[in-house]
Amino acid sequence: MSMRDNLDISAYLVLGPETTLGRPVGDIVAQALAAGFTIIQVRSKVCGARELMACAEEAARAIAAAGAQDRVPLLIDDRLDVALAARDADVKVDGVHVGQSDVPVETCRRYLGEDAIVGLSARAHEMRDYIATADMSLVDYLGVGPLHETATKPDCGMDDDGRVITRSLEELADLRRISPKPIVVGGGVKAADIPALAKTGVDGFFVVSAVCAAEDPRAAAAELVDAWRANAYVTGDGPAVTFG
């Protein structure tokens, strides 16, 4: 059984060397795993390929040291080439996360294989079109946001006019109802957001600074995980929910 068959995106950490306040990536990963995070993505818009590979290797070592290599996937953001190179160097990279303007998911799947995890993010209206028209068997989960504006990724949710469009709880609930794949939501998510976010029926949250920039990353990660576990319900048809 591959990780695709038992994928848990409920507590999703995104990090890179520029997000950890100078602390080792592996240390932040280890603390997040100890708190119960379930999936790790290495992302950097400033690292070259070799540096990103080294970062992935550090994260993979932390996952292995926690004994979680068979249940916590490690993904690379955007860079299919880095994921392939890391695998060639015997680094356990389990897949990639791409946007609709990045390498096509069909290409990612072809090169990484059937057991790899491929995640996709897009603007909400584009996600609707994708769900309606694309071969969803190629994708394992969908990333949606931002819930709030965020300095970590200021262009997240930006429309063609340069405005950042955040996602309402109603919109997230509607997307989850129509999606055949799990949905993870991020963009400035804090522990206080988790109860309402879980009520939408989405399958998880993703964070960067809430853990990576925290004075105590493990405590911050645990607060998020505990809030999710206390509020999430098994998705499916789910209850009818209202917000406000």
Task: List the predicted regions and their residue ranges.
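A short acidic, helix-capping loop that chelates divalent metal ions and anchors anionic groups
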Residues: 42, 48, 148-157
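Conserved N-terminal beta1-alpha1 strand-loop-helix module at the mouth
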Residues: 1-97, 114-125, 130-140, 163-183, ...
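Acidic/glycine-enriched connector segments
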Residues: 103-104
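Short, flexible/disordered intra-domain loops and linkers
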Residues: 154-166
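Non-cysteine beta-strand/loop elements that form the S-adenosyl-L-methionine
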Residues: 99, 139-149
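Short amphipathic secondary-structure patches
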Residues: 109-110
